[in-house]
Regions:
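GT-A fold catalytic core of metal-dependent nucleotide-sugar glycosyltransferases
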Residues: 83-128
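C-terminal non-catalytic accessory extensions
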Residues: 265-322
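Catalytic core and acceptor-binding pocket of nucleotide-sugar-dependent glycosyltransferases
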Residues: 145-289
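Short, acidic, metal-binding catalytic loop of nucleotide-sugar glycosyltransferases
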Residues: 22-32
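N-proximal low-complexity "stem/linker" segments adjacent to membrane-targeting elements
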Residues: 1-19
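Short, solvent-exposed loop/turn segments at secondary-structure junctions
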Residues: 11-14, 39-42, 56-59, 106-109, ...
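Active-site-proximal specificity loops/subdomain of glycosyltransferases
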Residues: 38-93
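Short beta-strand-to-loop element that shapes/binds the nucleotide-sugar donor at the catalytic cleft/hinge
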Residues: 124-141
Length: 322
C-alpha cells in the first residue's frame, strides 16, 4: 500500500500511554504520522512519525491563513471541527501521499493495511465516518469537499466562525459526512475498529448502524484485547470455543488507563483490559487457560464520568463553559 499520512495537531500533554500509541504506529511502515505539538518531552519517535513543534498560537495563525474570515479557533479542542479541512490546511505537507487521514492519540493501532488497502483508497473518497480516525483520498477536489454548500448554505463557514464545537468531523448531523453524501461522494461506513462504550466501567463495544444511523452497544462479555507484534486481537469464549477477531484499532475514548508494563518502548506484546495495559500471563491463549487470564481491574470510570458530565452541565448552565 502506498503511504497514508495521518495529521495530528495536539496541544497539551500527551496521555500516559502515548509511547504505546507510537509503538503501534511503528508497526505500520506504510503510513506516516505528522504531529504538530507543543509537548516537547523526549519520546522515542519512530521513523514514520514526524514531529513539528509549534505553539497553539502558531497553529491558530496557520489555520487562520487558509480562510478569508475570522475563525473561532480559541481552544485546542475546537480543532476537531477542522479535521475535515486538514487536507486543505496542511496541503503542503501531503505531496506524494495517496491518502491522508486524521486520528486521535487515545488509540492503539492494529495492522492498518489489513483493513485499508490501495483498492479501498481507489474505490472510496472517504473511509470512515468518525473523528477518532478517518482516511480521505488525497487530491485537490476531495480535499476541498468541506467547502461545498449544504442545503443551500455555507455549513463550513457556519461551523468555523463559531467557537463552540459542532462535531463537524463525524456522524451525519450536518457534518462532513452529510456534505460528502450530498456531493455524491463514496463513503465506506463499514467499521473495523473496537470503539469502547464510554458509559461503562467494562470494555463493551459500541458500533454505528449505517442504516438506522444510531449506535448499538453490545452485551457485556468476558473478553480481552491483545496487541502482539503489530496485530490487535480480541479473545473470548463462546459456546465452549475460543473466539478471536482482529481489529484496525481500539479507541479508548479518553478513558484513563493504568500501565503495568516493565517498559513501553520496543514492547512485543501486551494485554488491554479495563482499565490497564499489562503483560499477557500466558504464551498462547487457549480454552483451557482463558479463565485464568485476568480480564479486568476494579475501576470507577463510570462514576467519574457521571460526575464529570454533571459538572460540565453545571458550568454550561452558569456560563462558565460552552
Amino acid at each position: 500500500m502506498k503511504k497514508v499520512a495521518f495529521i495530528i495537531p495536539y496541544f497539551g500533554r500527551f496521555n500516559n500511554y502515548f509511547p504505546l500509541f507510537l509503538e503501534s504506529c511503528a508497526h505500520n511502515p506504510d503510513c506516516d504520522w505528522l504531529i504538530f505539538t507543543d509537548d516537547r518531552r523526549a519520546f522515542s519517535y519512530p521513523a514514520n512519525v514526524i514531529v513539528h513543534y509549534m505553539s497553539f498560537a502558531e497553529m491558530q495563525a496557520m489555520v487562520q491563513s487558509k480562510f478569508d474570515f475570522s475563525i473561532g479557533l480559541e481552544r485546542p479542542y475546537k480543532l476537531c471541527d477542522f479535521k475535515p479541512a486538514y487536507g486543505y490546511i496542511f496541503e503542503e505537507y501531503l505531496t506524494g501521499y495517496t491518502a491522508w487521514g486524521h486520528c486521535d492519540t487515545d488509540l492503539i493501532f492494529g495492522r492498518i493495511r489489513d483493513f485499508i488497502s490501495e483498492q479501498d483508497i481507489r474505490d472510496y473518497d472517504k473511509i470512515g465516518i468518525f473523528g477518532h480516525c478517518t482516511v480521505f483520498r488525497n487530491d485537490e477536489e476531495n480535499n476541498r469537499i468541506f467547502l461545498q454548500p449544504l442545503n443551500g448554505h455555507s455549513r463550513y463557514r457556519e461551523v468555523y466562525t463559531d467557537r463552540k464545537n459542532h462535531s463537524f468531523d463525524e456522524e451525519f448531523k450536518d457534518s462532513i459526512n452529510t456534505i460528502f453524501e450530498s456531493c455524491g461522494k463514496r463513503i465506506r461506513t463499514t467499521e473495523y475498529q473496537a470503539n469502547i462504550y464510554t458509559k461503562s466501567s467494562d470494555f463493551r463495544l459500541t458500533s454505528w448502524d449505517p442504516v438506522e444511523r444510531c449506535y448499538h452497544n453490545e452485551k457485556l462479555k468476558r473478553a480481552i484485547f491483545v496487541w502482539d507484534d503489530g496485530i490487535l486481537s480480541r479473545y473470548w469464549i463462546e459456546r465452549g470455543e475460543l473466539q478471536k477477531q482482529e481489529y484496525l484499532y481500539i479507541h479508548m475514548q479518553a478513558r484513563p488507563m493504568d500501565i503495568r508494563l516493565e517498559k513501553m518502548e520496543n514492547v512485543q506484546r501486551f494485554k488491554i483490559i479495563p482499565n490497564t495495559f499489562e503483560a499477557l500471563e500466558v504464551e498462547e491463549i487457549s480454552v483451557d487457560n482463558f479463565a485464568h487470564i485476568r480480564s479486568k481491574y476494579f475501576n470507577l470510570h463510570y462514576f467519574r464520568l457521571r460526575s464529570k458530565n454533571l459538572w460540565v452541565k453545571i458550568k454550561k448552565k452558569i456560563g462558565l463553559a460552552y
